[in-house]
Every structure is written in structure tokens, then in C-alpha cells.
């Protein structure tokens, strides 16, 4: 019995250690981008029959030169990078990260500026959608002396007074979103 108690304590201690985040080390020249979870981080995404699911936002982080020209995507959430939306009914969620999509300037066969299931972004720049605050480490090449880190954070179907659900395509407050 005593041996079983010690084993349980040992397993509990091991589980505590295994849940800690990996320590990120920074060197001279590295840039730390810290995204802080705010009050509205989780959004009620409508599923059906008035049932909602709490969803974190879609996020894109990219570099631009000092004139505002797109250079490279550093990080983008997995769902938009691979079009792996749940229960979307084929809706590609063009309203999710419109600034990043148009900044990249890559137009796909269907006329939209966001990745497709057939042409997803590479795994190296996409990652799971963070459910809270997180850090990104940038290690710019020596050739890149000055740049702007641009971040877009948005919720699909987050209709509000500025971008109402009933706005029609062509109107200035149309978000492109559909439930």
C-alpha cells in the first residue's frame, strides 16, 4: 500500500513538470512579439439552435518593409492556413483575416486571396490557434535591418455595429462574413 502511495505521488509530480511551457531563449537581434489575451479573446460562434461554441480569434503575423510592402508571413493560425473550418458548409471565411490576405497579394483560382484546402500554407508558418496569450520569437536575417511587424487578430462572424450581419456586399460596412 505504501509503495502504491509513493508511485501515485511520483506520477503526480511528473505530470506537474510535464505541463510547463518550453522556455524560449532570446539572443541579441531577436524580436519578441507578445500577444496578450484580452477580455473578448473567446467569441461565441453560433453552431445551431442557439447553441454557441467559444472560439479563439484567427491571427496572422507578417513582416513588411518600411514602405508597407509585404515581405513574409511569420505565423498564421492553422484554420485559415489550411481552410480546416468546422461546420463551415464550404464558406472559406474571407472575412477572417482580410488585411493579411490582401497584403500577401496571392489570388487563388476562385478569385479569393486566402489559401485553399488544395493549396494550404506550409506547416512551418502555421500553428494551432492559441487559446490565450502567447509569444512569437523572430530571428531576422542580417540582411533585414528595418522592418515592420504587422499583426491582424479577428473573429469570423463577430458582427457588431460597425460591421452588421445584415450588411450587403458592396456596402462600406460589409465584412464578407456569413454564419
Where are these regions (language model features)?
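Sec-dependent N-terminal signal peptides
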Residues: 4-14
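Bacterial Sec-dependent signal peptides at the C-terminal "C-region" and cleavage site
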Residues: 13-24
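Flexible, solvent-exposed loop/hinge segments and secondary-structure transition points
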Residues: 23-29, 53
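Exposed beta-strand and adjacent loop surfaces of beta-rich binding modules
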Residues: 30, 56-60, 146-148
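Short amphipathic, basic-aromatic surface patches that mediate peripheral association
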Residues: 32-54, 79, 159
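Structured domain cores in non-transmembrane regions
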Residues: 53, 64-166
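Short beta-strand elements
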Residues: 164-179
